[in-house]
């Protein structure tokens, strides 16, 4: 359970922003969304492999020299 201490004279918007930031750092929302529906192990492996391939091609594309502009 994530808790934050609200300081004296601290606006609630700032406290809410700090709370959202801590939740985002811990990755609780992404974990919650992933567990919202059951995913078969085969489809999970397929999704992770596709993400790895996408990351690989993105890394390769960023390492290529830019095209000549003339």
From Swiss-Prot:
Recorded coiled-coil stretches: none
Gene3D superfamilies, sorted: Ribosomal protein S8 (1.20.5.1150)
Any Pfam family the entry gives: Ribosomal_S21
GO molecular function ontology, one term from the record: structural constituent of ribosome
GO biological process, one term: translation
Signal peptide feature range: none
InterPro entries recorded: Ribosomal_bS21, Ribosomal_bS21_CS, Ribosomal_bS21_sf
Keyword Ligase in annotation: no
Entry's Gene Ontology cellular component terms: ribonucleoprotein complex; ribosome
Origin superkingdom: Bacteria
Keyword field contains NAD: no
Keywords on record: Ribonucleoprotein, Ribosomal protein
Family affiliation: Belongs to the bacterial ribosomal protein bS21 family.
Protein's name in the database: Small ribosomal subunit protein bS21
